[in-house]
Structures are given as C-alpha cells and as structure tokens.
C-alpha cells in the first residue's frame, strides 16, 4: 500500500492546529498505511504542546515529526515539506480544518482507484453559490462553465460548484486547504520570489506543476470543515492587492496572451464595484493599486519574474 505524509503548515495558531490534529488522531492512520504527520512551523509552538501532539498521534498509529523554519512563508513551507516527507503521497491541510473520521482512508482508496492520478483534492464544507451569485461570477470571469477549470482570468471560483458533484471528476486546480499529490509529481519544488510574502495562488501554481505528471481529481467524498481562521492574516488592502498581483504572475508564468490580462482587468474592476456599496475602502485601494499593474506586467517582471527554467518549460503550452 502507498505510504502517506500529512503536512500542517502553521504559524502561531495553536488552538486551530490542536483542533485539526485532534480530528486526524480520532480518525487514525488508514489500515496498513505507513503514515507520518509533519508540523512545519513558522511560529513558536511550546514544547509541552509538541509533546502532547506526539503522544496523541502515536496512539493513533501516526508518526509525529516537527520542523521549525527560519524563513517564514507558506510556499517555502510547501518546499520544505517536499524535502522532508517520506510518504508516497503528500497531503497538505490548512491548520484550521477538521477531518471526518474516514477522510484519510477515503483518500488512499481514491489513489488506488485512480493509479494515474498525480494529485487528489477535496472540498470544503459549505462552499456554494446562489444562482445569481453564479451568474455574477461567470460574467465577471471569476469562474468558468466547467467546475474543474479556472476562469479566463485564472480565478478558482468554479470550486463553489464542487458541492454539486456526486462522483470524482478531473480538475486543473485544487483548493489549498485540502490537496494531496504524489511526491514524485512535485519533487524538486523550488522557492518562487513572488510567493515569499503572500500566498494567494500558491495552490493554483502547485496544481499546475503537478498536472504535468498526470491528471488531478476532486473526490466529493473528501469533504472537510474549514474554519478559515482570521488570525495571522494580512490587512485587507494588502490582501486584495496581492490577490491580483499573484494572479498577474500566474498569467505571466503560463505565457498568457492579452485575453487573460483583459479578463483579469475586468474581474478587478468588478471587485471594486462590488466593494463600493460596502464602503470597504481598504479593499478598494488594494484593487486600484493592482489595477495599474495589469497591462504593464506583460513586458516587465514584477518582483521576481518567472519560475525556474525547469518548471516554466514544463508549464508552457
């Protein structure tokens, strides 16, 4: 049977992390599956907390491992996980999720059912859209007509339709709170300059890299609870600014033509119009700052340029 490495990338969210580990320990390791759990720490977890995790996971048949990073950042935590993990499958979970008891068993069974899969992801409970919300997202290029595809502006709003799925389906992107890959599909992961400070889009980039090794799938049976804890989040202006800027980098790295940038411009304009009635001035300011960079970005690198030559060649086409 395939072996499994679970990675929890965290920073100063002990309550969230403890709740997550509790849910993993209750479910336990899949039968016959060698399972390890890595806590990749950008903060300062107390020693007594770490010792409690080790005892708790040990009773559940899961080997506990810990690494404290020197340089913070979610993408760098992904890179470090790939360096350290020993499992055939690497499962990335946000530290503020809760797993149902059968989650890990269902995940490994899905890999057995889809041996060609480079990655398998799941769904966050409660993510859905109204009919009118779906129409607005389609018209503003925040989602595509297909639940497994990104929009023209490379937005992942299609995931709001994932809850309607009754069976496993192909996708070109994952939700970062709940995604797994064959270790070989993401081996050699490297730092990316534009993902060092803010992580929006890192799940899309990781999915794109893995997809060069094989198809990706979403299994609706892999549904978990995502609390989306607000702690350790950046201010709203920075969040909205980097949300657009990182999508610019995603367009650059896939060598998008003018249509992709035009679509992102329209999506950003829509976001500004949406926030005005709410008087969310910080969000609007962030979007306006990024709006100026969209078309100028097609010629000059922004904060680091492309991925490494190896990965940029893999993603071309």
Go through the PLM ranges and name each one:
Residues 140-171:
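Short, flexible, basic/aromatic active-site loop/helix in glycosyltransferases
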Residues 174-177, 197-206:
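Acidic donor-binding loop at a coil-to-helix junction in glycosyltransferase catalytic cores
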Residues 22-68:
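Acidic donor-binding segment of Leloir-type glycosyltransferases
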Residues 238-246, 257-317:
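Non-catalytic, C-terminal membrane-associated alpha-helical segments of glycosyltransferases
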Residues 1-26, 32:
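N-proximal low-complexity "stem/linker" segments adjacent to membrane-targeting elements
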Residues 69-85:
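Glycine-rich, basic loop-to-helix element that forms the pyrophosphate-binding segment
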Residues 102-146:
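Conserved donor NDP-sugar-binding/catalytic core segment of glycosyltransferases
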Residues 90:
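Short aromatic/hydrophobic "clamp" motif used to bind/position activated sugar donors
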């Amino acid at each position: 049977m395939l072996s499994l490495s679970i990675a929890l990338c965290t920073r100063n969210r002990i309550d969230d992390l403890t709740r997550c580990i509790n849910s993993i320990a209750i479910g336990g390791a899949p039968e016959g599956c060698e399972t390890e759990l890595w806590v990749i720490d950008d903060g300062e977890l107390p020693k007594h907390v770490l010792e409690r995790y080790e005892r708790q996971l040990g009773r559940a048949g899961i080997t506990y491992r810990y690494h404290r990073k020197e340089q913070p950042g979610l993408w760098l935590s992904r890179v470090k996980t790939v360096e350290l993990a020993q499992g055939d499958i690497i499962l990335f979970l946000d530290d503020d999720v809760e797993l149902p008891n059968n989650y890990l068993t269902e995940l490994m069974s899905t890999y057995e059912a889809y041996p060609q899969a480079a990655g398998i992801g799941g769904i966050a409970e409660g993510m859905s859209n109204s009919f009118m919300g779906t129409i607005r997202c389609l018209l503003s290029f925040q989602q595509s007509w297909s639940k497994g595809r990104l929009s023209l502006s490379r937005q992942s709003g299609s995931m709001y339709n994932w809850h309607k799925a009754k069976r496993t389906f192909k996708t070109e992107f994952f939700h970062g709170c709940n995604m797994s890959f064959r270790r070989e599909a993401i081996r050699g992961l490297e730092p990316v300059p534009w993902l060092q400070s803010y992580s929006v889009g890192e799940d899309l980039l990781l999915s794109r890299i893995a997809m060069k090794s094989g198809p990706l799938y979403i299994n609706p049976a892999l549904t978990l609870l995502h609390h989306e804890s607000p702690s350790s989040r950046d201010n709203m202006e920075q969040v909205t600014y980097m949300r657009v800027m990182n999508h610019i980098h995603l367009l650059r790295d896939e060598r998008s033509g003018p249509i992709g940038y035009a679509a992102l411009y329209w999506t950003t304009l829509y976001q500004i119009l949406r926030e005005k009635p709410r008087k969310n001035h910080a969000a609007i300011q962030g979007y306006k700052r990024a709006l100026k960079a969209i078309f100028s970005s097609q010629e000059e690198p922004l904060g680091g340029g492309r991925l490494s030559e190896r990965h940029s060649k893999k993603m071309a086409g």
